[in-house]
Curated annotation (Swiss-Prot):
<dbReference type="GO" id="GO:0140825">
    <property type="term" value="F:lactoperoxidase activity"/>
</dbReference>
<comment type="function">
    <text>Removal of H(2)O(2), oxidation of toxic reductants, biosynthesis and degradation of lignin, suberization, auxin catabolism, response to environmental stresses such as wounding, pathogen attack and oxidative stress. These functions might be dependent on each isozyme/isoform in each plant tissue.</text>
</comment>
<keyword id="KW-0325">Glycoprotein</keyword>
<feature type="signal peptide">
    <location>
        <begin position="1"/>
        <end position="26"/>
    </location>
</feature>
<feature type="disulfide bond">
    <location>
        <begin position="198"/>
        <end position="230"/>
    </location>
</feature>
<feature type="site" description="Transition state stabilizer">
    <location>
        <position position="65"/>
    </location>
</feature>
<feature type="disulfide bond">
    <location>
        <begin position="38"/>
        <end position="114"/>
    </location>
</feature>
<dbReference type="GO" id="GO:0020037">
    <property type="term" value="F:heme binding"/>
</dbReference>
<feature type="disulfide bond">
    <location>
        <begin position="71"/>
        <end position="76"/>
    </location>
</feature>
<feature type="binding site">
    <location>
        <position position="79"/>
    </location>
    <ligand>
        <name>Ca(2+) 1</name>
    </ligand>
</feature>
<feature type="binding site">
    <location>
        <position position="70"/>
    </location>
    <ligand>
        <name>Ca(2+) 1</name>
    </ligand>
</feature>
<dbReference type="InterPro" id="IPR010255">
    <property type="entry name" value="Haem_peroxidase_sf"/>
</dbReference>
<feature type="active site" description="Proton acceptor">
    <location>
        <position position="69"/>
    </location>
</feature>
<feature type="binding site">
    <location>
        <position position="73"/>
    </location>
    <ligand>
        <name>Ca(2+) 1</name>
    </ligand>
</feature>
<feature type="binding site">
    <location>
        <position position="75"/>
    </location>
    <ligand>
        <name>Ca(2+) 1</name>
    </ligand>
</feature>
<dbReference type="InterPro" id="IPR000823">
    <property type="entry name" value="Peroxidase_pln"/>
</dbReference>
<dbReference type="InterPro" id="IPR033905">
    <property type="entry name" value="Secretory_peroxidase"/>
</dbReference>
């Protein structure tokens, strides 16, 4: 009996250490981390993102997705920025990632002013915030102080959310990162400025569940529209906005699309069919001039701060890379 209790206590201590370790790591982040060491850090990142945005506004969803994919694999440590045949960028879910050149540009500008000070992980977190702000979305204070990870493995990217995931699987993947159902729905609201290839949803139009029919959850009028955009004989590479109603504006229309059966991705539309996620979607979709529902812009900022604190690295297990695409 004593042996079993001893093993149980040992396991509980290990679990407690892991939980407290994550909590301590997230507390190492703070607003204005570079206020003394590199006072212009955030403004340099902002101006860099803005210059790229002015040339191509679609870079905003690319940067947001890049940050999301970084945080869900190895934590928010810039590991997705590392190049290599076996690095995260080589994983199937990461093919087509955009915005890498923006981060490299910002890093080069920062190195010229504050060499070896600002991490690539922080640049990415700041750039994601700025990309939302430039798309008429909310802005929020980004706690900084992350260090860059030294490991990037394509095999670790299997836990990234997929457009084929059920709601249960989506919930579990987010829960594994310390994010709840409210965070899940809120963060997927980023699809209001997102894009995807026809390849990732064409099956819903022509051969749903191998029946030869269309997904019945798609509204008839929207189905006609999607078939025009993505014909059955196309190569699947055409880019389609995930929120056709207001593709370049960060707003609540994405949630109204779920309500109306106008979601592009199956995983998004499924949020309407689950009672728990449906309740959150309704709160966002029904909001009218701040009188009803949740404020999506405010809640999104909170969820992003929470997500950007996932498994951050410290001086012990991280570094400040000189070049974001490779470890020092």
């Amino acid at each position: 009996m004593g042996v079993y209790l001893g093993k149980y206590c040992y396991i509980m201590i290990i679990m407690l250490v892991l939980v407290l370790g994550k909590e301590v790591r997230s507390q190492l982040l703070k607003n204005g981390y570079y206020s003394t060491s590199c006072p212009k850090a955030e403004s340099i990142v902002r101006s860099t993102v803005e210059s790229h945005f002015d040339s191509d506004p679609t870079i905003s969803p690319g940067l947001l997705r890049l940050h999301f994919h970084d945080c869900f694999v190895q934590g928010c440590d810039g590991s997705v920025l590392i190049k290599g045949k076996s690095a995260e960028q080589a994983a199937l879910p990461n093919l087509g990632l955009r915005g890498l050149e923006v981060i490299d540009d910002a890093k080069a500008r920062l190195e010229a002013v504050c060499p070896g000070v600002v991490s690539c992980a922080d640049i990415l977190a700041l750039a994601a915030r700025d990309s939302v702000d430039l798309s008429d979305g909310p802005s929020w204070r980004v706690p900084t102080g992350r260090k860059d990870g030294r490991i990037s493995l394509a095999t670790e990217a299997s836990n990234l959310p997929s457009p084929l995931d059920s709601v249960a699987v989506q919930k579990q993947k987010f829960q594994d990162k310390g994010l709840d159902t409210h965070d899940l729905v809120t963060l997927l609201g980023a699809h209001t400025i997102g894009q995807t290839d026809c390849l990732f949803f064409r099956y819903r139009l022509y051969n749903f569940t191998v029946t030869g029919n269309s997904d019945p959850t798609i509204s008839p009028s929207f189905l006609t529209q999607l078939k025009t955009l993505c014909p059955p004989n196309g190569d699947g590479s055409k880019r389609v906005a995930l929120d056709i109603g207001s593709p370049s504006k960060f707003d609540e229309s994405f949630f109204k699309n779920l309500r109306d059966g106008n979601a592009i991705l199956e995983s998004d539309q499924r949020l309407w069919s689950d009672a728990e996620t449906n309740a959150v979607v309704k709160k966002y979709a029904s909001r009218l001039r701040g009188l009803l529902g949740f404020r999506f812009d405010y809640e999104f900022g909170k969820a992003m701060i929470k997500m950007s604190s996932i498994d951050v690295k410290t001086d012990v297990d991280g570094e400040v890379r000189k070049v974001c695409s490779k470890v020092n």
